[in-house]
Design a protein with these regions (language model features):
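Solvent-exposed, non-transmembrane regions of membrane-associated and secreted proteins
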Residues: 3-155, 159-251, 268-276
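Short, charged juxtamembrane terminal tails flanking transmembrane helices
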Residues: 278-283
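A cross-kingdom C-terminal cell-surface attachment/processing module
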Residues: 256-271
Length: 283
């Protein structure tokens, strides 16, 4: 009887530790979903002042005034935290295939990376456009969500959506690559291409001295056949995004719910054993 009680105690303790972590992630996920819904309802584009800030930033990028800095380097100065955008969320990154939805900030400061993904200093803002390349950095995982944990699972053709202002920009993954943390020429714009690059640490364990890149492109073709095919893809992509917009939680929430049911069941069985043990002692 005592061995059974000890066994149930071990199972409960072993279950409780990851369950608390998953519960924290689920709560964060629900909060982010409502924050996203609030953003969609209130977002009305950028003000004239913000448009001027955007133009000033893009001009600084084109002229090379802003240096590209590794957002995960321990020795870096936190210069990205100084942004004319302050703590304004400029948009949302959505990857339905990986169940990722993250707010986008300007400037990959520690504070911004704690809360979502951020535009790497020295790269374009994610508005799209030829000869532009926006790089969005995010942690491989964080205390409250998986963030870019599954980024290595992305495959060619997977869709990435950037909702910014009143605009939705759709990219399709072309390739992934792993570079050294100092190999920043890999993030330069590509002539006549509109590129979005997602960046995170690699491998999953220290010393994190490499970077995983996911490169996604927008396709531009003015031919009649291409325009027709592009419209079909656009409608399909829009349907995917609309479906994902309504999705509030990921599989982690369902796993957490199942875990709590299991926890209650084990606690009930343990309590029953303890009561039987007490009755046996009394007799």
């Amino acid at each position: 009887m005592k061995l059974k009680i000890v066994g149930y105690l071990l199972m409960i303790v072993g279950l409780l530790l990851p369950l608390l972590l998953f519960s924290n992630m689920t709560v964060h996920e629900v909060r982010e979903f409502f924050a996203y819904q609030g953003y969609k309802k209130t977002e009305s584009g950028f003000s004239k002042k913000e448009e001027e800030i955007i133009e000033h930033y893009q001009e600084a990028v084109r002229s090379g005034q802003l240096a590209t800095v590794d957002p995960f380097a321990e020795t870096r100065k936190d210069e990205q935290s100084v942004s004319d955008f302050g703590d304004r969320i400029i948009g949302y990154l959505s990857i339905p295939s990986l169940e990722i939805r993250q707010p986008i900030w300007v400037g990959a400061s520690d504070s911004h990376l704690d809360q979502g993904v951020a535009v790497v200093s020295g790269t374009d803002l994610p508005f799209g456009g030829r000869d532009r390349r926006s790089v969005l950095a995010g942690h491989r995982s964080w205390y409250s969500d998986l963030r870019f944990f599954r980024l290595n699972e992305m495959r060619e053709g997977d869709e990435i959506f950037v909702e910014i202002g009143e605009k939705v920009v759709t990219y399709r993954v072309k390739n992934t690559e792993i570079i050294k943390a100092t190999d920043w020429q890999k993030l330069l714009p590509i002539e006549k291409q509109d590129v979005l690059t997602l960046l995170t640490c690699d491998p999953l364990v220290p010393p994190f001295d490499y970077r995983l890149l996911v490169n996604a492109y927008r396709h531009h073709d003015s031919s009649e056949q291409a325009v027709s095919a592009s419209e079909e893809k656009r409608q399909s992509s829009q349907a995917v995004l609309e479906s994902y917009r309504k999705k509030g939680v990921s599989f982690i929430a369902y796993l957490t719910l199942f875990g709590w049911f299991l926890f209650v069941y084990l606690a009930y069985k343990l309590g029953k054993l303890v009561r039987v043990c007490r009755v046996t002692k009394v007799r």
